[in-house]
Each structure stands twice: as C-alpha cells, then as structure tokens.
Design a protein with these regions (language model features):
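Acidic, PIN/NYN-like endoribonuclease modules and their adjacent C-terminal/linker elements
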Residues: 26-30
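Conserved PLP-enzyme active-site core in the AAT-like
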Residues: 2-16, 23, 33-39, 43-46, ...
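Structural signal for short hydrophobic segments within the conserved structured cores
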Residues: 77-78, 136
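Active-site-flanking structural segment that lines cofactor/substrate pockets
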Residues: 47-77
Length: 244
C-alpha cells in the first residue's frame, strides 16, 4: 500500500508544472473577462431581463459589449436564439457570402454538420451551394496549415477563408493561435481584402490570445462550450469587424 501511495505522489509531482500552467492561463483569461465587465460597467440591473416592451435591452447590449471587449472585436452578437456553434457559423458565412463567391476552408473538411450547411451533404435546401456559393478546401499537411498551397488555391472569387481551430472529431492536432497568426499574416500580405473567418468552437480561453487579436476578421462559437462554462444549455456568438 505504501508503494502505491508513493506512486500516486510521484505522479502528482510530475503533473504539478502542467497544472500550474493551466491555472496561470485560467487566471489570465478570468482577469480578461472581469476587465470586460468592468469596462462596460455591468451592474445588477443587467441581470433582470426584459419584459418585452420597448426595444432597449441594456443587459443584452452590455453582454455583447463584454464579448466584444473580451475577444478584442469591434462588435459582437450574443443571443440565445443562436442555438449552437453550427448555427453561429452558418449565420456568419451566410452574411458574408453571396452568389458566385467562394468559401475556402484551409483546415480540411469542416464538421459533418457544416457539410450540410455548405451543400456537400444532404438535400442542399437552403445551403450555401443552393445560393450559388462555391466551395473549396485545402487539406492540412502533417496536421498543419499548408500556407503555400493556400496562397495558390485563392482565386478572384474567393471571398472568405475559413479556419476550423478545433480538431473536432478528427485525429489531427488543434490549430494553435501562433499557427493561425502565421497563416493570416501570409494570406493578408497577398490578399489584404479577403475575409478571414475562424470557427472558434472549443478554442475560447485555451490560450492567451483569441483569433481576432492575430488578424481574423470574424469568429463564431457556441455558448454551450467554453464561454458558457458548462452552464449554458443554448446560445451562440459572432464577433469581429463591425461592417461584417
């Protein structure tokens, strides 16, 4: 029994540096969120909700300002009517892509649920494809963004370059914020007007920076995941440039 106790202690001591790193990052991001609450002067009255009369909902307005400030975005849309991350991503793509525009995913194929949104799977009804949006993708190279191939794949019709930050259900590594920054910098040097969209699901607060801080124009995610702290049953957000 003593040998087992020693083994447990040895393993715990081995893991201490990793847990300290996680705790440090958690405190950093907690401070960032608290600073956002302070910046917008959120108060108890914001938690009272709305009766439905009138058009003003200060609690909702402040919540969206908090998200915008936290993610370093111009503006944010945070609503329970956005029921999931897929819904948020769909809204972001539909708002930026029109007939004959091309959507280019540079992290390989997205989630299965998004394949129906794009029009690759399913009956195509109300999909991007039905509205004349083209689709192309660039596979990862050894689990990383193949930047030279991405630059080559972009054409005159490419309107949005999309990055899926999380590995999702694949076996590949998730895309780090440093890698996202390298890809965005390289793309923007050649195509400064292209829109960079990042699917930020599962990626919020796992690093010190968020995609907008490294050049992304638009991000979207789910409140059911990291931002909801495991408490939210529904909701999603979109954040980024105000003109988008």
């Amino acid at each position: 029994m003593q040998d087992f106790s020693n083994l447990v202690e040895e393993v715990e001591n081995t893991l201490i540096p990793y847990f300290r790193k996680i705790e440090k990052r958690a405190l950093f991001n907690q401070e960032k969120v608290l600073n956002a609450f302070h910046h917008v002067k959120a108060s108890e009255s914001d938690l009272q909700g709305s009766t439905g009369y009138g058009y003003d909902d200060f609690g909702r307005d402040h919540l969206e300002q908090i998200y915008a400030h936290t993610f370093k975005a111009d503006d944010a849309l945070v609503r329970p009517q956005i029921i999931s991350g897929t819904h948020a991503i769909t809204l972001a793509l539909q708002s930026t892509l029109k007939n004959n525009d091309e959507l280019l995913y540079i992290t390989g194929s997205p989630y299965d649920t998004l394949l129906e949104v794009i029009g690759i799977n399913g009956n195509g009804v109300e999909s991007l494809k039905e509205y004349g949006v083209r689709y192309n993708e660039v596979e990862l190279r050894d689990g990383r963004i193949d930047i030279p191939k991405v630059i080559t794949a972009i054409n005159d019709n490419t309107k949005v370059v999309a990055i899926q930050r999380s590995k999702g259900y694949d076996q590949r590594p998730s895309i780090t914020i440093n890698e996202i920054e390298q890809a965005i910098t390289s793309i923007k040097e050649v195509y400064p007007n292209i829109i960079i969209f990042v699917d930020n699901c599962y990626g919020e607060f796992v690093e010190d920076k968020e995609p907008i801080e490294v050049g992304a124009d638009l991000i979207a995610g789910s409140l059911i995941k990291n931002p909801g702290g495991g408490l939210a049953k529904i909701g999603g957000y979109i954040a980024g440039r105000q003109d988008l």
